A protein has these predicted regions:
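Short, glycine- and charge-enriched coil/turn segments that flank and shape catalytic ligand pockets
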Residues: 9-16, 54-59, 67, 71, ...
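Structured adenosyl-cofactor binding patch, chiefly the S-adenosyl-L-methionine
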Residues: 204-242
């Protein structure tokens, strides 16, 4: 079934929704849909069944017929991704969205081959588009925000402004816990786990100096042996979400 992202929040069943210009054009000119065809609508919080009532490039409309069961996990998992080589970040944005990431933070780290540059805003737009399409294809109710790429220092500053219950750092050296054990350890002393940050380094991994800086954030930091996008899947498994 075709899915469309709405520009407004949906209040409930029976409401008629006007799609934005881009989605309207996609429905009419690319997919060539017709009134009466079933679709699904995503408003950033929920996913709804709907039926098209009017199809045109100027404004496609759909009437909401049912609220779908939420496909989203109970916790929000934010992916801090050390800048990888070339276009690898595009694949990461796609797969992270499919695996349920809430946000994606590209971060320049000491071992990053790719560096911040003047075309970063265009890259962000491209990554946001990839996340949008991946969310639609995978049936997400939420489209992850892809933040603009920042330096390691600015990412640390962001953590001061945006608190997390738990920060999991993928660490390939010794003394790292299996991710499932890290989550279990946290839940032994906390009732809820609402917001998690998963820190993944670039291809060369996370530098020791960066590990030490992250460690200063306190006891909510746990080093895990799970690296890459496997960390997202492992998190949901540990929380009983898969």
């Amino acid at each position: 079934m075709h899915r469309f992202v709405t520009e407004e929040k949906i209040s409930g069943v029976g409401e008629e929704i006007l799609l934005g210009k881009e989605e309207s054009a996609h429905a009419s000119k690319v997919l060539r849909l017709r009134p009466g065809e079933p679709v699904q609508l995503i408003d950033g919080e929920n996913r709804y069944d709907a039926v098209l009532t009017d199809v045109s490039a100027e404004g496609t409309r759909a009437r909401v017929t049912a609220l779908c069961p939420s496909p989203e996990a109970t916790a929000q998992a934010v992916l801090w991704q050390g800048l990888p080589k070339a276009d690898k970040l595009e694949l990461i944005a796609q797969k992270a969205t499919e695996l349920g990431a809430w946000e994606i933070w590209p971060v320049e780290m000491l071992r990053s081959v790719a560096r911040l540059g003047k075309n970063d805003s265009k890259k962000q737009e491209r990554l946001s588009r990839i996340a949008l399409e991946a969310a639609k294809q995978s049936g997400r109710a939420h489209v992850p925000e892809v933040r603009g790429a920042v330096s390691f220092e600015k990412a640390l500053k962001r953590l001061e402004e945006e608190p997390f219950d738990l920060i999991l750092v993928a660490w390939e050296e010794e003394h790292a816990l299996p991710l499932s054990k890290a989550v279990e350890k946290y839940r032994q002393s906390h009732d809820e786990l609402k917001r998690v940050l998963i820190v993944i380094g670039p291809e060369g991994g996370i530098d020791e100096a960066e590990q030490q800086r992250l460690a200063t954030l306190g006891p909510r930091i746990l080093r895990t042996e799970t690296a890459g996008l496997c960390a997202l899947a492992a998190l949901w498994t540990a929380m009983g979400e898969m």
